[in-house]
């Protein structure tokens, strides 16, 4: 009946087509509800018939009279329509709906007719009463969305004798969260049909909009192909891991208390925005009390590889290192150091792992390459993720999902090769290598580091060119980094042993420069 109709004054369809034939109160005239409904339906059918005829004229006539504002094609003048936001979302005029003052925008009959069916692919997004639809160049994906969240949703409402409205039963939060949740839900329901689509590389864009009379809103959310490929690969690798990642990062359960729901919704919004942007998410998924990795390590490892572009060799190194930390006798102390360390202390902590024999100098260089100044924070997050997941598996009696990637030795680049050459000369030529290394480790200022290198030159262990390479003028960042590479070589190959409390770190002045770079 009219009370449960999709269109009409104050009905759901008015959000898309305000004041259209079905939503204009003046068209709902009559003595009975049926007469009102018949009058509005007649107005709509007449408009639809007119647009269908003009759409046919676009295809049948060869005249190129005007350019359609929507599709950009040249169409016959007789097949054009004047449209404002009452029948074409987000179109604006001088005033809302008064023809005498607002001529609107010229569009062809094909576009006018096509937009009539937009509600069949439109859904509710977030909690701000905004709408959205998914645009994809893959017909199979677009058709699946329209069928599941359009036709089938409306059929269920009609069968249940409920008022028609757009689909919005998302157990998530935020607009980006709704978009990613949709892709997860589709993949979970139609894995065989959609895996190939997700990995096809065709772009998908979600358009979030509102068409309110007081002002329109539109936002394009571009879904990265890498994110879709990651979801498809994760679902193939493990359905359980896919579900853990989906529910652990995107789901907001309905049984949460109000304060819990608010906190969870904020987390989901932040995570989904980062996923859409292809940013680091593992750090946000770590909880320390109790230690836990939301989403599971298998999903995060694949996300790091597919979306973040982290090399599988690097992930294998970090996984092995994280397990070494978690399984050590000093695990609690080492984890606390990782959690509480300032950014400038992370290089020193990783050098400590080289001294323990858990990392080689090549691996240290591979994890912290030159010109990757912000990677240390993500390295710390990944290590903690491995530690927390390993501890969780031990408590639950489960097997840790280790990487199957075989260890591969990469050939050193010019910088690492130069460090190795200098390190060998120091190892062979310095009379007291351990003392010299201790001085280099404890140096807190650039001048002191240069002084330690000059001592090596004085003893003939290295030459002037080596000194210039290790301590470049006006580039203190490079000097600190090269110092760490050299120490890693000496700890690894030179087997220099220092007391456990001797940790290299940046000096106070240099810290400020590096952190604000």
What is each stretch, according to the model?
Residues 154-507, 511:
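Intrinsically disordered, low-complexity regulatory regions
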Residues 1-4:
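Long, acidic/serine-threonine-rich intrinsically disordered regions with weak helical/coil propensity
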Residues 514-515:
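Short, intrinsically disordered, charge-balanced linker/junction segments flanking boundaries
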Residues 6-167:
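Basic, glycine-/proline-tolerant helical and adjacent loop/strand elements
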């Amino acid at each position: 009946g009219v009370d449960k109709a999709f269109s009409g004054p104050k009905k759901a369809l008015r959000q898309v087509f305000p004041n259209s034939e079905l939503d204009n109160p003046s068209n709902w005239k009559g003595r009975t509800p049926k007469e009102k409904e018949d009058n509005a339906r007649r107005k709509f059918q007449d408009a639809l018939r007119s647009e269908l005829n003009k759409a046919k004229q676009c295809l049948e006539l060869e005249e190129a009279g005007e350019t359609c504002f929507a599709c950009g094609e040249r169409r016959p003048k007789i097949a054009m329509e004047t449209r404002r936001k009452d029948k074409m979302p987000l179109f604006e005029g001088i005033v809302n709906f008064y023809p005498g003052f607002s001529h609107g925008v010229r569009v062809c009959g094909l576009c006018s007719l096509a937009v009539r069916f937009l509600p069949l692919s439109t859904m509710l997004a977030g909690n701000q009463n905004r709408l959205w639809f998914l645009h994809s160049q893959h017909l199979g994906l677009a058709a699946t969305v329209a069928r599941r969240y359009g036709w089938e949703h409306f059929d269920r409402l009609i069968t249940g004798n409920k008022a028609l409205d757009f689909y919005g039963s998302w157990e998530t939060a935020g607009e980006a969260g709704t978009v990613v949740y949709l892709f997860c839900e589709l993949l979970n329901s139609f894995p065989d049909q959609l895996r190939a689509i997700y990995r096809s590389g065709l772009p998908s864009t979600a358009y979030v909009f509102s068409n309110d009379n007081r002002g329109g809103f539109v936002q394009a959310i571009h879904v990265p192909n890498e994110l879709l490929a990651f979801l498809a690969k994760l679902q193939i690798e493990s359905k359980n891991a896919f579900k853990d990642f989906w529910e652990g990062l995107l789901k907001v359960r309905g049984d949460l208390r109000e304060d819990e729901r608010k906190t969870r919704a904020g987390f989901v919004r932040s995570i989904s925005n980062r996923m859409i942007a292809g940013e680091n998410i593992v750090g946000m998924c770590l909880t320390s009390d109790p230690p836990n990795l939301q989403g599971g390590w298998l999903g995060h490892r694949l996300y790091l590889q597919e979306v973040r572009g982290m090399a599988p060799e690097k992930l294998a190194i970090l996984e092995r290192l994280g397990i070494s930390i978690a399984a050590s006798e000093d695990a609690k102390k080492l984890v606390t150091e990782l959690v509480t360390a300032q950014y400038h202390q992370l290089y020193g902590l990783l050098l400590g792992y080289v001294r323990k024999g858990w990392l080689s100098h090549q691996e240290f260089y591979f994890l912290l390459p030159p010109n990757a100044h912000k990677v240390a924070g993500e390295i710390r997050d990944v290590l903690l993720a491995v530690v927390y997941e390993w501890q969780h598996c031990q408590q639950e009696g489960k097997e840790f999902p280790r990487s199957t990637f075989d260890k591969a030795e990469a050939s050193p680049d010019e910088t690492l090769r130069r460090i190795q050459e200098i390190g060998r000369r120091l190892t062979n030529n310095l009379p007291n290598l351990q003392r010299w290394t201790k001085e280099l480790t404890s140096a807190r200022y650039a001048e002191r580091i240069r002084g330690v290198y000059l001592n090596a030159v004085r003893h003939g262990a290295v030459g002037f060119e080596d000194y210039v390479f290790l301590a470049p003028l006006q580039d203190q960042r490079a000097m600190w980094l090269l110092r760490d590479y050299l120490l890693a070589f000496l700890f690894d190959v030179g087997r220099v042993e220092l007391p456990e409390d001797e940790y290299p770190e940046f000096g106070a002045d240099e810290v400020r420069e590096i952190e604000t770079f």
